[in-house]
């Protein structure tokens, strides 16, 4: 911009080569009253003394940076948690020990139940066995009587049948023989008499004829000669002898009568058999009456189980060890968390120290970026105060859109700034701290949950100890009682059934004697006759085989005449407890409280601690989730605002929506402000100015080959109304230094932004 003497006054500006003062010390030569105060020069002090914090001062505050403070808060929460958890574990330990003592008492009482039950069982067993033995003796006597009667019935049946048949056969035969002999004798005697009489008569007739013939002859001869003497036939003596022949059947008949009288009726055999059979049976019955008349089984013969005193809590340090291990686990977890958090806090200190160091070195470098990217003075303050979030927003905006002068670029930076504001980051940091706290608590919870099954297993072992003791007591009592039963069984088998065996042997011997007696009777009757073998066959068929069958049956009775008394089961007192243990794997047994099917007091003590810790973790996790969702809502609000601004069309320049102006000049290098970079007089509002082009496109000084005169004013972010925009550009004084050029007056009042504010930048 050229100097206008008409408008600028009679005094030209001081050339830059002759101006030794900095632009910060220029004064308005056209204003005699000096309405604007002059900037004070820097104090002449030690350069190490500054009103702002240097690197050493910043590093001295690293120990309470935000992340370290958050980690310390998490550490305090963990310490409080472990302290409460230790107290809860102490209470759980006391409750578990109390519950274990109760379980021990219940287990001892239950393990002693066989002591009380065995007395009643002994009385019941003794009474039952005595009644059983008495009933067995009575039944045995009745069986013996019945067997005796059956044997006698069978013997009498077969002997009587045989006797009747034999007697009828023999007597009938003898009677027939007697009648035949007597009839034959009579017939022969009558025939002999008749024959002798006929012979006698015939001989008489013949003798008479002979006598007549003699007489005749003699009469004839006597005439002639002497009489003829004929022999006389005299057979009277022979006739008399023949008549004297008498067939006497009395001897034969008498013999048959004698044989008939000698045939036995087997009454003797029957009576002998009855007498012989009655002897062993009566002997056994007498012994049974004698032995069991005063037979008693006293309950005292059975043993009594001993009382049991279980001590799986008193003499078992598992519960103590278990809870001590949990407390030790909590302590170790606290130490581990302390170490981890302290290490993280130290790392945060070192990281923040490195960040501060880098930030301090780059702070001056950011001045150029601030000059190049700041939208207005407020944006410059934001970039300076929130350098990391501002830098992140600029990087995101540049990644999204390459046009840094576009509205979208500004909206993206605005959304990122909205999401990374101090309240939003505070909420996010609380959520992160809550997540860390929940993570530490969850790790501790998982460790305790892993240890809990050991307690459940040990409680199961407690129940197993009770059941094992019950089994041992039951087994010992059953063995002792079964020994008593075995002795009683041996006595019964040796006495009572020994008598039965003796009786069966006697009966067998008696039947053998009976068989021999029958054979003797047959021999006595039929010896020397053809009927002996026939009689033996008949007797063997009718009686002998039946007697053999009876003897076989008695032999079987003899071999199996013994009793086996029932024994007591080994688990007579422990079967119920074992079944209750096997019905539910979660100890729904006699050790559980009434109404508690799957838990018991011991597990409940630890379960309460676990549930309390889990509920605390869930509650804090929900709070953390709420904080995180709050931050997400903030982020969404920022994104929605950016999207709405993105979708809303901008106002035109005539509507006061478009901004126009140059960027602020940059008088800084990597060491800070450099007066050599500031030209004496420059008009940024002049597009032809090389410095203006450099500031707009270069992002910081460096192209100052052409020094424009009077670079003392800056035009920035003015609102330009409709009209001659070149003449309506608002000019702002730079560092209390007014230009020698007059202020451009606008014919119309400016909509806004027409105030003249000291400094480089004025917010829109």
Swiss-Prot record:
Ranges where the record places region Disordered: 653-701, 735-754
Q: Which UniProt keywords apply?
A: Cell membrane, Conjugation, Glycoprotein, Membrane, Transmembrane, Transmembrane helix
Question: Which residues face the membrane's Cytoplasmic side?
Answer: 83-149, 356-424, 646-764
Q: Which residues cross the membrane?
A: 62-82, 150-170, 335-355, 425-445, 625-645
What is the protein's membrane topology class? Multi-pass membrane protein
Q: Which domain of life is it from?
A: Eukaryota
Any single GO CC term annotated in Swiss-Prot or TrEMBL for this entry: plasma membrane
Which GO terms are recorded in the biological process aspect for this UniProt protein?
Answer: plasma membrane fusion involved in cytogamy
UniProt subcellular location? Cell membrane
Record keyword Cell membrane present: yes
Per the UniProt entry, the glycosylated residues are 271, 315, 479, 508, 527
Q: Which residues lie on this side of the membrane: Extracellular?
A: 1-61, 171-334, 446-624
Please state which protein family the record places this protein in: Belongs to the PRM1 family.
The protein's job, in short, is: Involved in cell fusion during mating by stabilizing the plasma membrane fusion event.
Protein name listed in UniProt: Plasma membrane fusion protein prm-1
Q: Which organism is it from?
A: Neurospora crassa (strain ATCC 24698 / 74-OR23-1A / CBS 708.71 / DSM 1257 / FGSC 987)
Q: Which gene encodes it?
A: prm-1
